Amino acid sequence: MFKLISDTSCDWIKEYAEEHNVTLVPLYTTFDGQTYYKEQFEISYDEFYRKMTDENAFPKSSLPSIQDYVDAFMPSVEAGVPIICCCITTYFSGSYNSACTARDMIIEDYPDAKITVINSLQNSASMSLFVYEAMCMRDAGYSYEDTVKKLEAMRPFGRIIFTTESLDYLTKGGRLVKTATMITSKLNLRPIIIMKGCLLYTSPSPRDA
């Protein structure tokens, strides 16, 4: 048995994670650069999207602190339970680095602690499935070591395929270049967007009918 921990990039709601004994470490969100909210703990996904649509607010995210991870790890470390921590791709966030630093700090005082931090190479929907697979292996009785091996092998294969009415938020967030947004807008196109290996690609799509 092992403890499963994930940052909130997996898009699980807090209640679902608690029901399935998965600890969430929140990323932070700000709309004004001054007030930061812990995702799922101080602002729900519904509130997040309502601010974007009703207030036309553009969010920015920040990684969990090292202390956030220390606080999440310590109960299991003190109980002698191995930990698997799944983190958003390092291409989008420094969450993995915070978790690794927290692990290294803890191991100085608890050298026998078993803490594996995984750079999932995923985000959002594919990260959700990654954590779900880890949970299923835990519940099926897979060992800590076997689960780590299988998760490491899964990392390169996640994909997200989606489309959206507007590319504005992806452009503002630096995920797509402005030229692509301008062209698709003028031609009234909704491109198919693929996230693969931490990068976004666009595929040709029919015009919006």
What are these regions (language model features)?
Residues 10, 122, 208:
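Short, glycine/acidic-enriched loop or turn micro-motifs at the edges of active sites
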Residues 88, 95-160:
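Active-site histidine-anchored catalytic micro-motif
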Residues 54-57, 63-92, 97-101, 148:
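Glycine-rich phosphate- or other oxyanion-binding loops that anchor nucleotides, phosphorylated ligands
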Residues 4-6, 85, 116-119, 147, ...:
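General beta-strand structural signal in soluble alpha/beta enzymes
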Residues 3-62:
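N-terminal glycine-rich anion-binding loop in soluble enzyme alpha/beta folds
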Residues 138-197:
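Internal, active-site/partner-interface "lid" segment
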Residues 201-209:
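Single conserved hydrophobic/aromatic residue that forms the stacking wall/gate
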